[in-house]
C-alpha cells in the first residue's frame, strides 16, 4: 500500500474540520430555534396577568390619575375644555387609554387604542389651526364615501361562509384586528376580554368608593376628607 504524503494529509484535514464546524452550527441552530419561538406569551399567562391584584392596582392608579386630569380639563377655566368630549364618552375614552397603557402596547388592540388617541389629538390641533368654510363640503363628501364603503362591505360579507362572517364581525369588535388571521384574532380577543373584565371590576370598585365617600369639603372648611377624584 502507498503511504499518504504529508501534503495530501494536509489537504484532507480542512474538509474534516469544516464538516465538524457545520455540524456544530446545525446543533446551535436547533438549540436556539425553540427559544425564538417562545417569545409571545401564551393566552393562559395573559389571563393570569389581567386577573392578578397587582395588575388591577396598576390600572386603578392609572385610571384615577387620568380621570383627575379629565376633570381638570373639563372645567370652564381650562382653555382646551371646548375640544374635549364630555360625559360617558369621555370617561370611556380615558378608561380605554389607561387600559392600553397598562398593557404596555404588547398587543395589537392596545397599540390600536394608543395610535387612535394620538390621531384624535392631532386632528383636534389641526382643527384649531385651520378654520375653513370648505370643511363642511369635505365632511359631507367623506360621510357619503363611508356609507358607500359600508354597503360594499355588507354585500361582500353576505357572500362569505358563516364562519368567515363571524370572524369578520369579531375582528371589527377588537381594536387593531380588522385584517388579521383567525389565530391572531382569537388570541387578541382572549386577551382583550380578560382586560375588559378587569376594567369593569376596577371601575365598579372606584364607583363604589366615590359613592360611599363623603362630599368634598366646602372652601374654608378644615379637617374634611378629600374626595378620591378631587
UniProtKB/Swiss-Prot annotation:
SUPFAM superfamilies reported in the protein's UniProt record: HLH, helix-loop-helix DNA-binding domain
PROSITE patterns: BHLH (PS50888)
Gene that encodes the chain: BHLH147
Feature: compositional bias, Polar residues: 1-17
Subcellular location: Nucleus
One GO cellular component term noted in the UniProt record for this chain: nucleus
Record InterPro entries: bHLH_AtIBH1-like, bHLH_dom, HLH_DNA-bd_sf, IBH1-like
Protein's recorded name: Transcription factor bHLH147
Gene Ontology molecular function, alphabetical: DNA-binding transcription factor activity; protein dimerization activity; transcription cis-regulatory region binding
Major place of residence: nucleus
Domain annotation bHLH: ranges: 147-196
Function of the protein: Atypical bHLH transcription factor probably unable to bind DNA. Negatively regulates brassinosteroid signaling.
Top-level taxonomic group: Eukaryota
PANTHER family with a match to the protein in the record: TRANSCRIPTION FACTOR BHLH147, TRANSCRIPTION FACTOR IBH1-LIKE 1
GO biological process: regulation of DNA-templated transcription
Chain spans, region Disordered: 1-52, 210-230
Entry keyword set: DNA-binding, Nucleus, Transcription, Transcription regulation
Lineage: Eukaryota, Viridiplantae, Streptophyta, Embryophyta, Tracheophyta
Keyword match Phosphoprotein: no
Subunit and partners: Homodimer. Interacts with PRE3.
Residue ranges, compositional bias (Low complexity): 33-46
